[in-house]
């Protein structure tokens, strides 16, 4: 008998990158990653595939399935397949979304449930074990799974605050990729005292100033161009940042700012695409093939 599970989780944008201080903040965005799991007692290994990258590294999604099966003492094998609307290695939390969707789809397949934060922590553990993240990305994982705006303590894997928000989001996603595990941690740690100031702004609910300060700090530390941020500020945008460790930029925008900022970013000269989306508040879901949750 084959057990099947299906789930999706969302991407996220950065308010505070946690690499400098282990404290982070992020917001869910309405770009999805889907996972399909098929399991059987006749199989003994988990084999993963990523639709957009046939030769891509599948250790994360495979490890997520293995950890769920281990949690419930199940000896099953099979396949895990993911596909995504989120640009890979762009700072938009594609790994967190893939981990969350993989864990949730596996739970769906085996008919088990876990509390939301335990699901998130299992995906974070898988990400740490296979080396795709520096801090464990607990902030990104919470934003991806829970939706809304989250503030976290990544070192202790604590969710400090979550609230819903309503905003359009404009993203500039360069064609080049930047893998989180390759980022310059030493230079990021140099800016820790100033990132701490941005984190305090986030705790006070001043998310736009927090993310903009975060963006200038990390662009400086990691060598990314601040022109995209300055163009956003020229358009009247209050909240814009390098997302994650780059190379994407994300801005919280009003409806009447979308066209102007899109044009400003497209005229900057870097190859890439502008994505228009919004903050997602609803969080990850599992569903049957017909799409019912």
Curated annotation (Swiss-Prot):
PANTHER family: HOMOSERINE/4-DIPHOSPHOCYTIDYL-2-C-METHYL-D-ERYTHRITOL KINASE (PTHR20861), SHIKIMATE KINASE (PTHR20861:SF3). Pathway: Metabolic intermediate biosynthesis; chorismate biosynthesis; chorismate from D-erythrose 4-phosphate and phosphoenolpyruvate: step 5/7. It comes from Methanosarcina mazei (strain ATCC BAA-159 / DSM 3647 / Goe1 / Go1 / JCM 11833 / OCM 88) (Methanosarcina frisia). Pfam families: GHMP_kinases_C, GHMP_kinases_N. Its EC number is 2.7.1.71. This is Shikimate kinase. Belongs to the GHMP kinase family. Archaeal shikimate kinase subfamily. Disulfide bonds: none annotated. Keywords: Amino-acid biosynthesis, Aromatic amino acid biosynthesis, ATP-binding, Cytoplasm, Kinase, Nucleotide-binding, Transferase. It is found in: Cytoplasm. The keyword Nucleotide-binding applies. The keyword Transferase applies. ATP binds at residues 87-97. GO terms for cellular component: cytoplasm. Its main location: cytoplasm. The lineage of its organism: Archaea, Methanobacteriati, Methanobacteriota, Stenosarchaea group, Methanomicrobia. GO terms for molecular function: ATP binding; shikimate kinase activity.
């Amino acid at each position: 008998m084959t057990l099947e599970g299906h789930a999706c989780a969302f991407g996220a944008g950065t308010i505070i990158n946690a690499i400098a201080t282990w404290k982070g903040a992020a917001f869910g965005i309405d770009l999805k990653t889907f996972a399909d799991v098929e399991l059987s007692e006749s199989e003994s290994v988990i084999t993963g595939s990523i639709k957009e990258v046939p030769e891509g590294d599948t250790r994360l999604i495979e490890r997520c399935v293995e950890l769920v099966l281990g949690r419930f003492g199940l000896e099953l094998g099979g396949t895990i397949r993911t596909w995504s609307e989120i640009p890979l290695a762009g700072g938009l939390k594609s790994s967190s979304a893939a981990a969350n969707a993989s864990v949730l789809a596996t739970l769906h397949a085996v008919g088990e449930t876990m509390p939301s934060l335990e699901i998130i922590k299992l995906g974070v553990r898988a990400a740490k074990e296979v080396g795709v993240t520096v801090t464990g990305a607990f902030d990104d994982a919470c934003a991806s799974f829970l939706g809304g705006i989250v503030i976290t303590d990544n070192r202790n894997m604590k969710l400090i605050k979550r609230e819903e928000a309503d905003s359009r989001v404009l993203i500039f996603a360069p064609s080049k990729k930047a893998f989180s595990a390759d980022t310059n941690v030493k230079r990021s740690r140099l800016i820790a005292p100033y990132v701490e100031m941005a984190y305090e702004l986030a705790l006070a609910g001043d998310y736009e100033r927090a993310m903009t300060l975060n963006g200038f700090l990390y662009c400086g530390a990691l060598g990314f161009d601040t022109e995209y941020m300055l163009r956003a500020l020229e358009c009247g945008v209050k909240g814009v940042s390098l997302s994650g460790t780059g190379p994407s930029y994300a801005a919280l925008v009003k409806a009447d700012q979308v066209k102007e900022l899109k044009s400003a970013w497209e005229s900057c000269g870097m190859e890439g695409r502008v994505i228009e989306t919004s903050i997602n508040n609803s969080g990850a879901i599992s569903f049957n093939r017909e799409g019912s949750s």
